Amino acid sequence: MNFLSIFVLIPLLMLAGLWAAQGIKAIRGVMVTGASTLLIASIVLTFMYLGERSAGNTAEMLFRADTLWYAPLHISYSVGVDGISVAMLLLSAIIVFTGTFASWRLQPLTKEYFLWFTLLSMGVFGFFISIDLFTMFMFYEIALIPMYLLIGVWGSGRKEYAAMKLTLMLMGGSAFLLIGILGIYFGSGATTMNLLEIAQLHNIPFAQQCIWFPLTFLGFGVLGALFPFHTWSPDGHASAPTAVSMLHAGVLMKLGGYGCFRIAMYLMPEAANELSWIFLILTGISVVYGAFSACVQTDLKYINAYSSVSHCGLVLFAILMLNQTAATGAILQMLSHGLMTALFFALIGMIYGRTHTRDVRELAGLMKIMPFLSVCYVIAGLANLGLPGLSGFIAEMTIFVGSFQNNDVFHRTLTIIACSSIVITAVYILRLVGKILYGTCTNKHHLTLTDATWDERVAVICLIACVAGLGMAPFWISHMIGESVLPVVSQLIP
């Protein structure tokens, strides 16, 4: 069996184990065992990949396997990874692992919750290892479907509205995406849906590219919270349970940026060159609009949700700059934001679980009451605003340096506008930290609250270690990513 298939097999075994498990301890045991195995497998895969590259293996995708699945449509179960895929698998495994501990005390319907959570995880892992267009789309849909139930059943606030809005908008994006994928397949004249073989043929007519590229980019862009299709994201984040928000913002939204780069840009480079300016304007709006919107929110989850719109907009913005440095920064930003936003949502969930409010106006003085959670919140905020030594700094600096390499007025003007988001982010992060962590607590019920439990500390410490590790030692992963973006970027250079 191909090693990559482990990332689909383990979630399947977890589903079977959860189905058979009786009692909360057995359910937790299945989840911890499965999530730990996935994390170990992703770390092993990372070292295997780096070892292959060090040994001189220059293949675009490593550890490939192809099994014909449905001959009439040339659909295969085709898997393979490059540095981008490996990084995304590692991110996904970290967040599934920490999300398991963040959901440790979730009640009721614990078994059903973890069944859907595991199915969502399987869709994410399957998407990142797939190199067949149809298989990618299948896993993409598997990842989206559980969101409706996870938010609608276990969410809070206007959960039914948020779940339906999220589902309808993302399924609308999926319709665009399916049309785009079919257009790519038939337009290329390929006898397979393997994206590497379609890229090698490189014969989709330019006129067709100009039709299928916008559809594909928009299809994935909806999931990446591209303006003006971002409105599902804040409502979905605000209503979702803690671990679902972590996986949703930390990983699921990254499927959008990954798909735009891996499929839309890679398979239709001429259209990407011709039409990128349109989407650059939209992504530039996402970056600034998301940051400004975060400034005026009073709900902790909405603040982080709009912050995610801004940061994910920056990912798409960098991809559209069509050069290696900016594209490398985009993938680093996907990693950095995935870790940071998962940390934020975990901490917000822990604070809400104690105070039963997410309203900034009702929170104050938490540093004296919950020092561990408060210090961790400060670290998350500093990473979000780009403090050197944490992951946000290296990702954003790589993006802006790469974006400024385009020496025309249009690209540089947009880059300067996007850079303003750094200042805006500092405004809402520092205001938020000062308001909820310091000052005098006026709610007497908050004075008796306890700090983080052991399971919460495991989740938070893991994420902080990853944020700091990526910020202080980024070279190995940036080098791995930089090599992998080159085959795509080389086709984009006019």
Where are these regions (language model features)?
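Cytoplasmic/organellar membrane-interface segments at the starts of transmembrane helices
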Residues: M370-F372, I429-P494
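Transmembrane helix-loop-helix hairpins at membrane boundaries of multipass inner-membrane proteins
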Residues: N2-F3, L18-F101, R105-L115, N194, ...
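Hydrophobic alpha-helical membrane-insertion segments
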Residues: T33-L50, L170-I181, L373, Y377-L385, ...
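Hydrophobic transmembrane alpha-helices and their helix-loop junctions in integral membrane proteins
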Residues: T98-W104, M122-F134, M147-K435
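Central hydrophobic cores of alpha-helical transmembrane segments in multi-pass inner-membrane proteins
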Residues: S5-A20, V32-L45, L89-S103, L120-M122, ...
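Cytoplasmic juxtamembrane regions at transmembrane-helix boundaries
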Residues: F101-W116, T242, G250, H445-D455
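Membrane-interface helix-loop-helix modules in multi-pass inner-membrane proteins
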Residues: M61-A87, L133-M136, Y140-Y148, L385, ...
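Alpha-helical transmembrane segments and their helix-start/interface "positive-inside/aromatic belt" motifs
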Residues: K25-S36, Y161-M171, M370-V375, T453-C462
